[in-house]
């Protein structure tokens, strides 16, 4: 690293220019600052892209109306802004001048904007900056206008994260200066999506109109393509809706649906056999019922006969006993034909019932 002595020795031959021609001084200052930043780009870590925003220029420029203090005062309010915003604030103020670098190069002039692009008040304060040039060459201080001019031009130099200027053609100033999220250009950019969204909103409306216009001829085409239905056939293709208005039984007389004579005779025979079998079952049931009835009557008759054979009878020949008999005894007396019994039995023993 160079010492301030060698740097001052190297710059002894330079003479401050007259206030009438301040553009050469500004060019030399910007060239020095640019070549100072080039050898240190590889050594320093990259800072976030929002640190070197153009919004910092009005704060550090000597002609800025936003700063109440003068540029040469070095107020403590302005130093924290320089330390936090610009990458040069972290460097030693004694390292502002490069070592063994030419004072001007074509690449540096391509990257430098014209003096007309600066603020209008910056040209008024150039005379003061030129008057203090010898002091800044000997011993630069962080509060002097030389240091402020370097920091102001440092905002125009390429960012440490960007490539160093080379033989390629230079990019526009807007691309070289990094943008910060709070910069006025970034504030104007969010308004672009709504502007881009407005055509998007208007886009579907013509499509709908085109679709509606396309649907109109499309709706006419099917009407024209409908085939003509031949006379005698229904529109829906249902055969039972014929123009002749015949009955369904007459329309469905197909050959597969007709039954043969043998099939008809067979079905008739089956029906007859079923009826005969049902009649036979009824007759069998009636026969069983009659047989049961006869058995019951025979059983009754046989029981009565057995009772008569087993009873003891007494024939009452004296009618006076009947008169003297009580009602209970008269209930048990019956009149019977005893002729058969008398014939079977001997006459000395007549049949009587007690």
UniProtKB/Swiss-Prot annotation:
Residues bearing PTM Phosphoserine: 18, 24, 47, 53, 61, 64, 75, 86, 105, 108, 123, 183, 212-213
Biased composition (Low complexity): 49-58
Keywords: Chromosome, Citrullination, Coiled coil, Nucleus, Phosphoprotein
Stored InterPro entries: CCDC86, Cgr1-like
Biased composition regions of type Polar residues, renumbered to the chain: 97-107
Residue ranges, compositional bias (Basic and acidic residues): 31-44, 199-211, 267-289, 297-311
Residues recorded with modification Phosphothreonine: 60
Protein origin, superkingdom: Eukaryota
Annotated localization: Nucleus; Chromosome; Nucleus, Nucleolus
Basic residues bias locations: 232-248, 320-330
Citrulline modification, residue list: 336
Positions in coiled-coil regions: 274-317
PTM per Swiss-Prot/TrEMBL: Citrullinated by PADI4.
Region (Disordered): 1-354
Main location as per UniProt: nucleus
Chain's role: Required for proper chromosome segregation during mitosis and error-free mitotic progression.
Descriptive protein name: Coiled-coil domain-containing protein 86
């Amino acid at each position: 690293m160079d010492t301030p002595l060698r740097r001052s020795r190297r710059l002894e031959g330079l003479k401050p220019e007259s206030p009438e021609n301040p553009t050469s001084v500004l060019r030399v200052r910007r060239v020095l600052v640019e070549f100072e930043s080039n050898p240190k780009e590889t050594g320093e870590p990259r800072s976030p892209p929002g640190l070197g925003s153009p919004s910092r220029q009005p704060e550090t420029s000597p002609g800025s109306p936003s700063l109440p203090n003068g540029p040469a005062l070095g107020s403590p309010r302005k130093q924290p802004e320089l330390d936090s915003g610009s990458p040069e604030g972290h460097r030693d103020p004694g390292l502002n001048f490069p070592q063994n670098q030419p004072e001007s190069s074509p690449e540096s002039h391509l990257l430098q904007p014209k003096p007309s692009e600066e603020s209008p008040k910056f040209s008024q304060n150039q005379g003061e900056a030129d008057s203090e040039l010898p002091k800044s060459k000997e011993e630069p201080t962080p509060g002097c206008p030389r240091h402020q001019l370097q920091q102001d031009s440092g905002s125009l130099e390429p960012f440490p994260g960007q490539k160093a200027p080379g033989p390629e053609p230079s990019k526009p100033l807007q691309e070289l200066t990094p943008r910060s999220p709070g910069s006025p250009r970034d504030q104007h950019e969010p308004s672009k999506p709504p502007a881009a969204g407005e055509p998007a909103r208007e886009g579907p409306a013509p499509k709908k109109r085109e679709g509606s216009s396309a649907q109109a001829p499309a709706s006419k085409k099917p009407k024209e393509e409908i085939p003509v239905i031949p006379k005698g056939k229904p529109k829906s293709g249902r055969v039972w809706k014929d123009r002749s208005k015949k009955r369904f039984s007459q329309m469905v007389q197909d050959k597969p649906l007709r039954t043969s004579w043998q099939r008809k005779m067979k079905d008739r025979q089956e029906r007859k056999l079923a009826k005969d079998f049902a009649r036979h079952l009824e007759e069998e049931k009636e026969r069983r019922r009659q047989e049961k009835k006869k058995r019951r009557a025979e059983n009754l008759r046989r029981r009565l006969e057995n009772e008569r054979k087993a009873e003891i009878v007494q024939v009452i020949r004296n009618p006076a006993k009947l008169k003297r008999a009580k009602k209970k005894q008269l209930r048990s007396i019956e009149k019977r034909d005893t002729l058969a019994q008398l014939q079977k039995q001997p006459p000395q023993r007549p049949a009587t019932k007690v």
